[in-house]
């Protein structure tokens, strides 16, 4: 079965290299969009990916690992995710799975790499899979490329740390998101 294109909240295909807000598919108490935050309740480095409780968050861009046709993002294909923002940290805005201060387990952090060039770069590969709600999707970590088995394949969900910061972590459950083009 051929993979299906990922679509935004307007039903249009999501494209590589275009800015999107990634927002909770559940409105209201489900929280807002994705942004970055430091350890504890600080906005300092290092940074992890968090869900803003109210706003649309920061713009995100998807990058293909392999050459793609028509620039369309498809379900269950390895890709890189990065924030299209400037940060005052000595790390990239690309996502990766890593340990993070104050969080037990694997956390979605910044400092990732683009493309595939060895085991370490697979920590920056995510897939987008269809979820249950209309136009909703989940992020999944399970690179198709040769990798170390140190980090298990799993979905991305929200974890409330002791400061009630909504951090993205790997878990069996999955947070459902929708994609909203920033310049609709």
Curated annotation (Swiss-Prot):
Key word Aminoacyl-tRNA synthetase present: no
Superkingdom of the source species: Eukaryota
GO molecular function: serine-type endopeptidase inhibitor activity
Compartments (UniProt record): Secreted, Extracellular space
Disulfides per UniProt: 45-89, 142-153
Stored SUPFAM superfamilies: STI-like
GO cellular component terms attached to this protein's record: extracellular region
Keywords in alphabetical order: Disulfide bond, Glycoprotein, Protease inhibitor, Secreted, Serine protease inhibitor
Chain positions carrying an annotated carbohydrate: 84, 90
Keyword Membrane (UniProt): no
Pfam families the UniProt entry points to: Kunitz_legume
InterPro entries assigned: Kunitz_inhibitor_STI-like_sf, Prot_inh_Kunz-lg
Residues spanning the signal sequence: none
Family affiliation: Belongs to the protease inhibitor I3 (leguminous Kunitz-type inhibitor) family.
Protein name: Latex serine proteinase inhibitor
Originating species: Carica papaya (Papaya)
